[in-house]
Swiss-Prot record:
The gene is tsuA. Changing residue 25 to A: Cannot complement a cysPUWA-tsuA deletion mutant. This is Thiosulfate transporter TsuA. It catalyses: thiosulfate(in) = thiosulfate(out). It is a multi-pass membrane protein. It comes from Escherichia coli (strain K12). Mediates thiosulfate uptake. Residues 22-44, 92-102, 170-197, 269-289, 339-352 are cytoplasmic. NCBIfam families: thio_trans_TsuA. The lineage of its organism: Bacteria, Pseudomonadati, Pseudomonadota, Gammaproteobacteria, Enterobacterales. The chain crosses the membrane at residues 1-21, 45-65, 71-91, 103-123, 149-169, 198-218, 248-268, 290-310, 318-338. Changing residue 306 to A: Can complement a cysPUWA-tsuA deletion mutant. PANTHER family: INNER MEMBRANE PROTEIN YEDE (PTHR30574), SULPHUR TRANSPORT DOMAIN-CONTAINING PROTEIN (PTHR30574:SF1). Its main location: membrane.
Amino acid sequence: MFSMILSGLICGALLGFVMQRGRFCLTGGFRDMYIVKNNRMFYALLIAISVQSVGVFALIQAGLLTYEAGAFPWLGTVIGGYIFGLGIVLAGGCATGTWYRAGEGLIGSWIALFTYMVMSAVMRSPHASGLNQTLQHYSTEHNSIAETFNLSVWPLVAVLLVITLWVVMKELKKPKLKVATLPPRRTGIAHILFEKRWHPFVTAVLIGLIALLAWPLSEATGRMFGLGITSPTANILQFLVAGDMKYINWGVFLVLGIFVGSFIAAKASREFRVRAADAQTTLRSGLGGVLMGFGASIAGGCSIGNGLVMTAMMTWQGWIGLVFMILGVWTASWLVYVRPQRKARLATAAAN
């Protein structure tokens, strides 16, 4: 038990620290792809996926890890991924983003985290068993893309690496925009860790390595998976309500560690502030959390479980879930940002 607690907390704290300092926000990244046509954060996600994919399949080939992709619940993945995408825009962050922003002191993220936790737990209760069983009927035999085409997984990993290297090199060749910065207050390692602006691609490499580390640490405790946010988040509430130790696992300490790591990073970099939410933000965050919990539960994963881990494992669930997650973000971005701005411009033009 002690080793499970320690390894889960350390892995989570590393992830929370890196995501907070690197401002690694997939919600903002997917939104920017649509609104400002900026794909940098998506390319960063591809880097993290690639690093993890190469590492995990190397460990599997060496006989150090085991993994079965199972069946592909396509209907739940499509519907859930889209709903989750809608929810993360309203909540102001994805599942992991909500955890690390709660560690920064954002009350809106606390609200989103609570409703996300409640809905995730509800979706694992007998009340949702009928819906879950119905969605499970709409599945295909193979979740693994390689198994579907009777291929080795390595050609797929190679294609991912080539695409990732190409888009990253293309992005790095673009002219750099100068960003105004304040004079540094710190020097050396303290400046790098707590003050210097982190490049998203460097952050992505670190996240990929942490995601890789999560596999052996998690499997050592009997949990045969890597990073995962939704189920452990639900497990916290299930344990608090039922008091049953069966809900305590490595993933629970992972998500608690994300909060701790983010808090440490925010305090050390002087970015921690308790920021209250107005009525509109409160309602939007609460609704966003509900949609996140519902969507991630029926999709079988969130932006980390499907978007980072299952994509790295070369599964249909990961890549198709990611596509519909992005489509959900774009739809919500149009409703929340683009449409109101367009209406405001038209009203201004009419007034003039």
